[in-house]
A protein has these predicted regions:
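Hydrophobic alpha-helical connector segments
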Residues: 89-126, 180
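Generic hydrophobic, amphipathic alpha-helix propensity
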Residues: 26-35, 52, 77-81, 85, ...
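C-terminal alpha-helix
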Residues: 161, 216-224
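Hydrophobic/aromatic-rich alpha-helical bundle segments in the mid-to-C-terminal region
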Residues: 144, 152, 166-215, 225
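N-terminal intrinsically disordered/low-complexity leader segments
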Residues: 1-26, 92-96, 224-226
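Amphipathic alpha-helical packing segments from all-alpha helical-bundle domains
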Residues: 107, 118-133, 140-167, 208
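Helix-turn-helix
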Residues: 30, 38-72, 76-77
Length: 226
């Protein structure tokens, strides 16, 4: 989490009294951090722009100059969570493609599956997913954003990873994105639904399912021996 921002009156200012780029970025991060917490604690309907401004220590005109309404603020929170979700997927894909001696597919997918479950079941992720679900009919564009920029970009990113493995001869797949979609659903399906519905996850059962999901996927994509 970002550190508590300085009040606007004491923040360092650039030429002409305007916030420096660094200070503006810190303030932006603080606003998104506070908004995330309030949306999680109070839900979409229970959170107001005024409450976010007060908790973040910024003036209402400052907040409204950046976000015209609550929907725009929620979109910023959603984009922030999407970046966190995509970061480890992108890193895994890039590392696999750039390695002179690629890591074994089983090792990479085992590590990735662990990371996926941790992030997918984080309280912040689960709570925001509930908010999106509750507001899907009222704000269908936000639901589409979560699906297209979150899930589908995740699928494409894992698809790049699997594509690199295929080029290295470690696996055989016809369509990397279809394979990625199947992998993500195998690994995350049951556990993410339990977290979404507030059902306690049995850690031992989840770990058993995770290992089985990776093994089942690999069994279907390993090249046939000559």
């Amino acid at each position: 989490m970002a550190a508590t921002a300085e009040p606007e009156s004491t923040a360092k200012r650039g030429t002409g009294g305007r916030p420096t780029r660094e200070e503006a970025a810190r303030r932006e991060a603080r606003i998104v951090e506070v908004a995330t917490r309030l949306f999680i604690e109070r839900g979409f309907d229970g959170t107001s722009i005024d409450a976010v401004a007060e908790a973040a220590g910024v003036s209402k005109p400052t907040l409204y100059s950046r976000y015209q309404d609550k929907r725009a603020l929620f979109e910023a929170v959603l984009q922030d969570r999407i970046r966190e979700w995509l970061a480890p997927l992108s890193a895994a894909a890039e590392m696999q493609a750039l390695r002179a001696t690629p890591k074994d597919a089983a090792t990479v997918l085992d590590e990735l599956s662990r990371n996926l479950l941790v992030r997918a079941q984080a309280p912040e992720t689960t709570a925001l997913t509930r908010c999106i679900t509750a507001q899907a009919l009222q704000f269908p564009d936000l639901a589409r954003l979560a699906y297209e920029e979150g899930w589908l970009r995740g699928v494409r990113t894992v698809g790049r990873l699997l594509g690199a493995m295929a080029e290295q001869g470690q696996i055989t797949i016809d369509d990397p994105e279809i394979a990625a979609d199947l992998f993500l659903n195998l690994v995350m399906g049951r556990s993410s639904k339990q977290a979404l519905y507030g059902i306690e996850v049995d850690v031992e059962v989840q770990e058993k399912r995770r290992r089985a999901a990776v093994a089942l996927f690999l069994a279907g994509v390993r090249p046939n021996p000559a």
